[in-house]
Swiss-Prot record:
Protein name: Alcohol acyl transferase 1 allele RGb
Additional note from the record: The fruit of cv. Royal Gala exhibits a high ester accumulation, whereas the cv. Granny Smith contains low ester levels; this influences strongly the ripe apple fruit aroma.
Iron-sulfur found in the keyword field: no
Recorded coiled-coil stretches: none
Keyword hit for Transferase: yes
Amino acid sequence: MMSFSVLQVKRLQPELITPAKSTPQETKFLSDIDDQESLRVQIPIIMCYKDNPSLNKNRNPVKAIREALSRALVYYYPLAGRLREGPNRKLVVDCNGEGILFVEASADVTLEQLGDKILPPCPLLEEFLYNFPGSDGIIDCPLLLIQVTCLTCGGFILALRLNHTMCDAFGLLQFLTAIAEMARGAHAPSILPVWERELLFARNPPRITCAHHEYEDVIDHSDGSYTSSNQSNMVQRSFYFGAKEMRVLRKQIPRHLISTCSTFDLITACLWKCRTLALKINPKQAVRVSCTVNARGKHHNVRLPLGYYGNAFAFPAAVSKAEPLCKNPMGYALELVKKAKATMNEEYLRSVADLLVLRGRPQYSSTGSYLIVSDNTRAGFGDVNFGWGQPVFAGPAKALDLVSFYVQHKNNTEDGILVPMCLPSSAMERFQQEFEMITQEPKEDICNNLRSTSQ
């Protein structure tokens, strides 16, 4: 295995990729879901591809993706613009066609040599997604940065950084799919993009009709060691949920929940409990976990057209005092997670938009008592084919301060879910211990044993 301390990535000067044809010069408003403070962040994604001569016939991936990107921007031209801030901090897109920042690079390494180093939290992210000075702002900066790095094995890594106000994971996937289709020879995207951000404007007059614990002010009883501004001792580590881990967790929940809880629910309950224990949060402190819930599709009755690529989700929060969360069996946390997710519907999303306008676009709390989880396992990044087949890995490159992403990962023997966590170093060691204990094979079914002794 090579030493990654001497990994050499050679980059050409960044260039701005503009739409291949003339596009409208106009101003477009973001929705009131899009421009909330919580989404004014950059999200890194990494996608890794093997060489596949039988499919691409020695095509240059940089050239193919660059050309397809320019053609796709004809349809997604707002992404080639720049954000401006209007009255009351309302964000608008100046569709000026300035372009997306694009970097061509090469590295003296193979995918096989990289091994698990491509998985989140990717320790080589700064090499495969270089942060060019002045490019990472929210206002007046490129809305996307894409770096394509060719490897010595013939494979390549596409890493990108997205201004989250422009779209969510499903919107980004729609754009990447359009690029991929054009790289494979399509003349137009199979799904045409729809802007229509006014569909998620606040109502007139705005009215808050639901409880939104995710935006509530928190009285923090902790020692202040974990805040978003205290990054000096923060570390990241990923945790794997395979068949064995899920089997063990399911043995810890009451029978009436087994048939109704999803893998996402169970993982979220596990992480919430382990994290609260690891941080040694004051027993009387209120702790919360928010689940990002996609509003698309028929399930939540939010009427959005096919092709809508804006942010279309909310993150309802489950709330508990730390003491009962830590002391009760897993079923306690699981029921709270399920109830929080069940609150999501069209009325909830519209109430969020109204709250954001009435309260000046508040951000979620930055205290350690809050965790946000986002399920990217069904976003479809693993299906994006630029002409080299499906990626060996594709998804978020790391966790954010209080945000963990669930990503699909296939190890040597099975499909599972990988979850990067961000915690203070001392808490991370305790989290590791709690995780290992809670996912150990039990000698007997605890819940069934409790039921039998109570009869």
